[in-house]
Every structure is written in C-alpha cells, then in structure tokens.
Amino acid sequence: MQLTRLVQVDCPLGPDVLLLQRMEGREELGRLFAYELHLVSENPNLPLEQLLGKPMSLSLELPGGSRRFFHGIVARCSQVAGHGQFAGYQATLRPWPWLLTRTSDCRIFQNQSVPEIIKQVFRNLGFSDFEDALTRPYREWEYCVQYRETSFDFISRLMEQEGIYYWFRHEQKRHILVLSDAYGAHRSPGGYASVPYYPPTLGHRERDHFFDWQMAREVQPGSLTLNDYDFQRPGARLEVRSNIARPHAAADYPLYDYPGEYVQSQDGEQYARNRIEAIQAQHERVRLRGVVRGIGAGHLFRLSGYPRDDQNREYLVVGAEYRVVQELYETGSGGAGSQFESELDCIDASQSFRLLPQTPVPVVRGPQTAVVVGPKGEEIWTDQYGRVKVHFHWDRHDQSNENSSCWIRVSQAWAGKNWGSMQIPRIGQEVIVSFLEGDPDRPIITGRVYNAEQTVPYELPANATQSGMKSRSSKGGTPANFNEIRMEDKKGAEQLYIHAERNQDNLVENDASLSVGHDRNKSIGHDELARIGNNRTRAVKLNDTLLVGGAKSDSVTGTYLIEAGAQIRLVCGKSVVEFNADGTINISGSAFNLYASGNGNIDTGGRLDLNSGGASEVDAKGKGVQGTIDGQVQAMFPPPAKG
C-alpha cells in the first residue's frame, strides 16, 4: 500500500499498519527534533501502548531512488477522528535524548571533562547511539553538580557553557547523536553539495531547488568580558575579553559578566569566545525555502544561481522545518499529489556556530546541612586550607567517604594572614552549607549544628545559662577526654571554668595581673617551678602557714633577713629557740654543745649566771612534733574519692 508513496512508515506494529498522511518536523542544531505525524490505519483499535517509547521511522524518496530516513522514538500518540474507511492517529517522534527530559537526579561528578560527563550520563541511562566529533581538548572540572534538574537540562547547560552542540544522523533503524564543536563535524549529503535557486516564476521543478530566499542581519554586542576569583591565587587577575568585529555603526557594544565559572585565564578566554560566538551567530541568518529533500540540520551545501552573487556561498544548516502532505489513501491514486517542502535556517559556513545559553541553571535557594566525611579510621580530614569534605543529604550515589564532595572552605570567626581562629569540622558532624551565587558547584560551609547523634555538650534546658567551648581529644578520645572553656551565667553562681586535658601553657609578653576577691585554692599534683628574673614581693595581711611534708631548703647569696614584731620561735622536737621583741633569747633543750674552730667569746653587760640542775623555762609545746606536722600535711592531700 505504501510502496508507491513519497514517504513510507516503518513502525513496531508491522508493515502498512500505519500510513503517513501528513508530517510537520523541526530540527535545530543543539536542540531536540520533533516530527509530528498524522497517520491513518484500517484498524480503528490499535494498541497505543505498543507504540509509546518504541522506535519508528519514515523513509523519504530522494531523486534517483535513494531514500532519506527520519528516525525517532514515539514520545506521544493519540487517536483522532478518521476519514472514510480509515481511522486517524497522531504520533510525535523525538530523539532518544528526549527521554533524558523524563528523568532527574542529584549527583556529583568529579575530575571529569564535560564530554566525559555527557557520555557517562548517556551510558548510565543505557544509551550508546552517539558519536564524538569534537575537535579540541576540554578542561577537567574538579567538581560539577547535577542538582534537582533533568538529565537533559544538566547536559544541555554544560554543552552551552563549553561551546558544544549536537545534531542527528538518521538511519533506517536508529538515529545517532553527533557531538560537535567545529566545521569539521559537518558534511554535504550525497547529491546536495550544491543546490540551485530557481525563482518561483520560472517553474523549474525537475530537481530539488530553492525558490525563496531571505537574509537578515541584526545588531549584536561586539565583545564580552568575563571575570572570576581564585582563592588559591587571590591576587591573580582573571579578567578576559573576546570580541568579534562587524562593519556597521553599532558593532562595538560590550557585555560584562561575573562570575565566569573558571579559575584559569585560558579557560576564561575560551568561555568568553564561546559566548560571543553564540551571540554573533545570530548576527546574520539566511532562510531558504524550497523542495530540498536531502538536506537537514547539520548539513553543508553551496547555494548557486541566486541573483546576488555574495550569497552564492557555502552554508551550514542550523535549523530545518519540513512539511509533507500525501494524497488521501481512499483515492487509490498512489503517489500522485504528494508534496514536500522545507525551510532551512542557515549561517555562513565560515561562521562558528555556538548555542545561546537558554537552559536554566539550578539555583540553591538558601543554605543546606551536610555531614562531614573522610576516610575510614580518621576523625579529622582536612587539607592545607582547613577545608573538609561532606556528604549532602540529597546525594544517593556517594559512599560517604573522602570522595563524596570537593574540598569545601569553612567560614571561621577570623581569617587573617597567619592569624585568626580555627575550628575544623570533624567527621560525623553536621554543618551548614551555603552556595556562592546560589551555584551548587560552589559550596562554602558557614556554620555547624547539633543533632540527635551529635548532641550538645551541656544538659539542656537544665543548664541553659552555660555557654562555652568543649573539645574532644583525637584520635580515640572518649567523653572523659576534652579541653573546655565554660561560662556559667546563672545569677549568684557565675563561673568561668577552664579545663586542660593535658598541658596548659600561658605566655604573657609583658605584665600579668591576678585579682581574687575572696578565696583562692591552688592544687598542684606534682612539681612546681617558679623562675623570677628580678624581685619578688609577697604580702600577707594576717597569717601565713607553710606545711612541708619533706625537707625545705633556702639558699641566699646575700643577706637573709627574718623579722618578727613579737617573737621568732624555732622548734625541733624537744629543742626550742625563742627570740623575743624585748631582746630576750631563750634556748631550751635536753643538752647543748657549743663548738668553735677558733676563739670563743661571751660578752655580757650584766651578770652571767651558769646554773646546773635547774628546770627549763621554755617548753616544746606547739607544732614541733613531727607526727603532728605529718598529720597536718596529709590532711591537705586527701586520697581521691573511689567510684
């Protein structure tokens, strides 16, 4: 039934089940094609579900008997009112990348170029009908995020940024996506290297030709300047500029944008070039209408026979529209009356083609939380900038380890040149992540929060008046291993508490002052060493008591002066020496010896009495008993409480 027709249908339901009555199609470089098919069938009960998602193709007869194919996936089908003995159906054919508009994800790609990312997305979704015709190297992205967007939007915006576009090569059983970035990816189809222009009044219809021509030129910006910032080279100048000159009066209007999404100037130069080429690709467009069955988007051809000689040149087809109408099948008239017409949107083949960015870039509207991650067995994982890695709650693909994200900078209270504050978030902690310009590719940690697993250091709300900072020893620290500075603001019980888990070093480069309004209690578990470079003065308003459990030694290179207003009393066991304010000196003991290696003198201004057998007037009562001293010393060092 179709053999004599201009266009034939090949569908999953079998030969001649569906017949083409009319087709409208649109193709465009870097965009998805759509072919709207108006079909008829002798069967009014076709199962539409057996068409959806299945491949279907049309074959268009070309001059000389060869055929051109339009192949796609049935994205939509419907049954409509028929005509006579035929039921009516409609189907929309889309390319296989259209199926990427039906799936979305949140995932992270690291250390890959955009072509590598695109191919990975295709393969992960089970597609292999693509071809790489790219001509230049592409930079490696350290970090690239697909965030709450379809897989198609994700790869589309990346291609728009990198200056990549695509088109489709059709075969009978498949269509192939061709990744392109330059003239070399395109060819002229067989028999169509040159296509003539015939004015419609001449009526030449013996070969494919154009019969209508339009050319338009439009003012576009003449230059684009981009800028960005690299924190690893904060003083680097990253501003780049690209321009394309045009010979008209308004050709030099500049564009400026920030951020340019790069940290290397050569990448910025390429991005600026891509964008100005995309803009300037709109400067001149030629639209040709005719009967040219073999040419579509992505093809090259040379126009001939047009009255304006400068337009007889080589063109790249950047867009194509097709209209096919076939005679009603009820007439039985075969292919008579079938019509084909196309409109081609073209640019000069010497002009670079780029896509204007039109795919929405996802914006993270507000901060998120994430969990700090790192290698197994580590508690802190950071780099030389104090950056950490995190697992985002939306990322279902990572393994929550050191490969989960890029290194992310952490906001600190101060950040000076070799000075400031530093608290590195630790593995397992929950942090607040913001995004520069809302860009999911540019995260920055701005805070930290507690949760049911990472709980607060003080029992709440009972201790709501307490604030401070409490750390944890690492590696292998337990809740008993920490440093802490804590403030208690409860009225009447205010306190500043400082706990050092091991050592505490205080360095004062000038003066230090300590003032205690009431009591001060000082306890040292082992030794104390005090070095005083000049003088020391100590004043005690009332009593001063010193208890020494062992020996005490005082060494003085000069004068050792001891003064007492009432009495100096030295007691050792049963020996007592008293120095009284009235000048009386009393010495008492069970015996005494006076030794001199030289002469000895006793001078007295009054009488000198030497008595034997008399009782001592000075006793050893008081604190001179060793057992009493030992007891008092031990009382100052009670044993630690058990349990």
UniProtKB/Swiss-Prot annotation:
It is found in: Secreted. Its main location: secreted. GO terms for cellular component: extracellular region; type VI protein secretion system complex. It comes from the Bacteria. InterPro entries: Gp5/Vgr_OB (IPR006531), Gp5_Vgr_C (IPR054030), T6SS_RhsGE_Vgr_subset (IPR017847), T6SS_Vgr_RhsGE (IPR006533), T6SS_VgrG/RHS (IPR050708), Vgr_OB-fold_dom_sf (IPR037026). GO terms for biological process: protein secretion by the type VI secretion system. Disruption phenotype: Deletion of vgrG1a shows residual type VI secretion. However, simultaneous deletion of all three vgrG genes (vgrG1a, vgrG1b and vgrG1c) totally abrogates bacterial killing. Keywords: Secreted. Part of the H1 type VI secretion system (H1-T6SS) specialized secretion system, which delivers several virulence factors in both prokaryotic and eukaryotic cells during infection. Forms the spike at the tip of the elongating tube formed by haemolysin co-regulated protein 1/Hcp1. Allows the delivery of the Tse6 toxin to target cells where it exerts its toxicity. Belongs to the VgrG protein family. Forms homotrimers. Part of the type VI secretion system (T6SS). Interacts with EagT6 and Tse6; these interactions are required for Tse6 loading onto VgrG1. Interacts with Hcp1. This is Type VI secretion system spike protein VgrG1a. It comes from Pseudomonas aeruginosa (strain ATCC 15692 / DSM 22644 / CIP 104116 / JCM 14847 / LMG 12228 / 1C / PRS 101 / PAO1).
